[in-house]
């Protein structure tokens, strides 16, 4: 399991083969055999004895900043599972198997988008014909993408071409779901040109942090991607994996407009666009956090929606090194204190 220390003033130390979590006068003992990683946020501390035990047991210690982004990590210097995982990640990146992995993530994104539009079509009969046209176009592009073969290096441009065409089709459909005065011309970033893109960009930023953290805890290298190439200081794998989860932000932001919670005073004007102000962040994150924390049924267990990212990353890493079967997710728990 992942031992996550979030309470201000938490102190972690060692007692034999046990980790002891102390919060004021309360203590909780956790067997080191059950811990896969220790995640520490601001305001918590740990002893050097606890660090030594973690190193002995090949347990990663990850430090997160105030917004949940990893900024540091402690692990042992001996070859272990993280080394094996990253070696396999590098090997897969330019193989046919790597291509199938990358296509799987994008196909999952397409499926999420189609399902979202189908559900929207059921609720908005006046848009049925227009949404059906977009859905059918996405399904045709999905077929083309699924048929791609070869090594990633040779077909990367083809994949990104299909992805670009699908993106334009999808956003044209999403635009139909918004009130007329909030509709947008195209996707825009840094800064957003309109309210929809402003909310969406901030939501995607939250997801980037979630996916990066999950990669690091699972022993994956966030900088070695498959579709997105590993340019210097570019978290390519994060850009690849986030495709599976973008729909969470899409659904949340469209839902805010549908509920008429989006007002002009949630945004501040810039010279060339918009930025989300403090009130806007409260409105967005209240809705988004509730959505991410919702308990869902996933891989035969009840789990928070946000924790499925961690489960997916651990599962993938373990499969790469032959550690688990398709049915075994028994070690993917999270304990937060």
Cite the ranges covered by each PLM segment.
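Active-site helix-to-loop segments that bind/position phosphate- or nucleotide-bearing substrates
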Residues: 1-15, 21-24, 29, 71, ...
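Short alpha-helical basic/polar micro-motif
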Residues: 36, 48, 52, 205
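Short hydrophobic alpha-helical runs that function as membrane-insertion/retention elements
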Residues: 38-41, 59-65
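Compact, well-ordered interaction domains used in eukaryotic information-processing assemblies
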Residues: 43-46, 51-53, 58
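Short gly/pro/ser/thr-enriched loop/turn and capping motifs at secondary-structure boundaries
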Residues: 47, 67-73
């Amino acid at each position: 399991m992942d031992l996550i220390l979030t309470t201000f003033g938490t102190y972690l130390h060692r007692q034999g083969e046990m980790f002891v979590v102390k919060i004021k006068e309360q203590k909780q003992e956790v067997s080191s055999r059950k811990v896969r990683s220790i995640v520490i946020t601001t305001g918590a501390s740990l002893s050097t004895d606890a660090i030594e035990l973690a190193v002995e047991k090949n347990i990663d210690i990850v430090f997160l900043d105030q917004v949940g982004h990893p900024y540091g990590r402690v692990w042992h210097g001996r070859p272990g599972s993280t080394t094996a995982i990253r070696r396999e990640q590098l090997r897969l990146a330019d193989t046919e198997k790597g291509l199938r992995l990358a296509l799987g993530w994008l196909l999952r994104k397409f499926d999420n988008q189609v399902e979202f539009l189908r559900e929207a079509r059921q609720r908005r009969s006046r848009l049925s014909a227009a949404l059906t046209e977009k859905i059918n176009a996405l399904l045709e592009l999905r077929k083309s993408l699924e048929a791609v073969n070869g090594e990633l290096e040779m077909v990367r441009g083809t994949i990104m071409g299909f992805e670009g065409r699908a993106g334009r089709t999808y956003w044209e459909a999403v635009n139909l779901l918004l009130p007329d005065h909030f509709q947008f011309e195209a996707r825009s970033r840094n800064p957003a040109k309109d309210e929809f893109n402003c909310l969406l960009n901030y939501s995607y930023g939250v997801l980037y942090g979630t996916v990066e953290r999950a990669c690091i805890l699972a022993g994956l290298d966030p900088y070695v991607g498959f579709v997105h190439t590993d340019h210097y200081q570019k978290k390519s794998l994060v850009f690849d994996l986030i495709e599976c989860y973008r729909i969470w932000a899409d659904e949340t932001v469209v839902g805010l407009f549908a509920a008429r919670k989006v007002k002009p005073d949630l945004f501040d004007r810039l010279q060339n666009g918009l930025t989300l102000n403090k009130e806007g962040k409260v409105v967005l994150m209240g809705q988004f956090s509730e959505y991410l924390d919702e308990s869902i049924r996933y891989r035969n267990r009840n789990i928070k929606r946000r924790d499925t990212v961690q489960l997916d990353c651990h599962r993938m890493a373990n499969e790469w090194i032959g550690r688990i079967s398709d049915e075994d997710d028994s070690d993917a728990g999270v304990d937060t204190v």
